[in-house]
């Protein structure tokens, strides 16, 4: 059993926010992008329990207790998703 600190410390966000920002125009766009994907992943897990499969599941390996938002961040970081703005996104806040 090892004690002490990790050689490469991990922060609260893994992958780091700086890496994720390479895939979005702004931190706000990243938050919306990740939240929408996390909702899709959450719906997938709910539908899986009900025997329905209408959403696409996680595109990366995940742990059983991992949060949908963490999975979405890893998908974004690995370049598995592409951010596109729809009409609803363009009209929000205007």
UniProtKB/Swiss-Prot annotation:
Identify the EC number(s).
2.7.7.6
Gene3D superfamilies, from UniProt? 3.90.940.10
Q: Which InterPro entries match?
A: DNA-dir_RNA_pol_omega (IPR003716), Pol_omega/Rpo6/RPB6 (IPR006110), RPB6/omega-like_sf (IPR036161)
Query: A Gene Ontology biological process annotation?
Result: DNA-templated transcription
Asked if the keyword Repeat belongs to this entry, the reply reads no
GO molecular function, a single term: DNA binding
Task: Enumerate the catalysed reactions.
Answer: RNA(n) + a ribonucleoside 5'-triphosphate = RNA(n+1) + diphosphate
**Source organism superkingdom:** Bacteria
**Record bears the keyword Transferase:** yes
Give the protein's biological function. Answer: Promotes RNA polymerase assembly. Latches the N- and C-terminal regions of the beta' subunit thereby facilitating its interaction with the beta and alpha subunits.
Q: How does it assemble?
A: The RNAP catalytic core consists of 2 alpha, 1 beta, 1 beta' and 1 omega subunit. When a sigma factor is associated with the core the holoenzyme is formed, which can initiate transcription.
Family assignment from sequence similarity: Belongs to the RNA polymerase subunit omega family.
HAMAP family in UniProt = RNApol_bact_RpoZ (MF_00366)
The record, for PANTHER family, names: DNA-DIRECTED RNA POLYMERASE SUBUNIT OMEGA
**Mind telling me what this protein is named?**
DNA-directed RNA polymerase subunit omega
Q: Which organism is it from?
A: Bifidobacterium animalis subsp. lactis (strain AD011)
Task: Name the encoding gene, please.
Answer: rpoZ
């Amino acid at each position: 059993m090892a004690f002490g600190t990790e050689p490469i410390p991990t922060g609260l966000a893994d992958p780091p926010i700086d890496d994720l920002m390479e895939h979005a125009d702004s931190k706000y766009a990243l938050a919306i992008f990740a939240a929408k994907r996390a909702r899709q992943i959450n719906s997938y897990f709910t539908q899986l329990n009900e025997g329905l499969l209408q959403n696409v599941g996680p595109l990366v390996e995940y742990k059983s207790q991992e949060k949908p938002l963490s999975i979405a961040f890893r998908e974004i970081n690995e370049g598995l998703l592409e951010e596109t703005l729809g009409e609803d996104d363009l009209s929000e806040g205007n």
